[in-house]
Amino acid sequence: MGPDELAELVDRHSAALVLYARQWCGCPEDVVQTAFLKLVRLRARPDNLVPWLYRVVRNGAIDASRAARRRQKYEAAAADRADPWFSPSDDPTGLDARTATAALADLPAETREIVVAHLWGGLTFEQIAQTVGSSAATCYRRYAAGLATLRQKLGAECPATPTR
């Protein structure tokens, strides 16, 4: 199959194939692209090209849907098994683990990464800077801002001055 013939086939059928695949999976464009790649790699052209494309797209979309369900199931199971950031405490005056975890999760990702790396990982700001690709001063500022946000949300005592 020549490039012009393939381009015409893509132009004529790709939109309908994407719509067709969308009923089974959340990545219909990927499935359609894979179907066209399979077509290009064939040694012999299928007798009924358009029905062949629909069958390949259908099978690919169903496979993608199954893979997504499996992935979601395993990711949910892994999240359920993951250790919480905070351990529940028997001290009624202490922080509630769920509230503290939620407050930490609400921080921007780059700030949360720095707070966790410094508080729980024991990394210095220089080490964190090397890890995240920022300067130590930027990491320090984000850490201080993260602690201030946590302090405000939790009404908890946090170290006022982070240690370098």
Question: Language-model segments: what does each one mean?
Answer:
Residues 105, 109, 113, 121-141, ...:
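Helix-turn-helix DNA-binding module
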Residues 34-50, 67-69, 153:
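Sigma70-family region 2
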Residues 5, 130-131, 147-164:
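C-terminal edge and immediately downstream basic/flexible tail or linker adjoining helix-turn-helix-like DNA-binding
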Residues 48, 58-77, 93:
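Arg/Lys-rich amphipathic alpha helix in sigma70-family domain 2
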Residues 1-29, 40, 44, 112:
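A short, charge-rich alpha-helical start-of-domain segment used by transcription regulators
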Residues 17, 21, 28-40, 53-56, ...:
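Short, small-hydrophobic-rich alpha-helical interface motif
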Residues 23, 99-108:
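Short amphipathic alpha-helical boundary/capping segments
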Residues 100, 114-115:
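Short alpha-helical "packing" element that flanks the helix-turn-helix/winged-helix DNA-binding module
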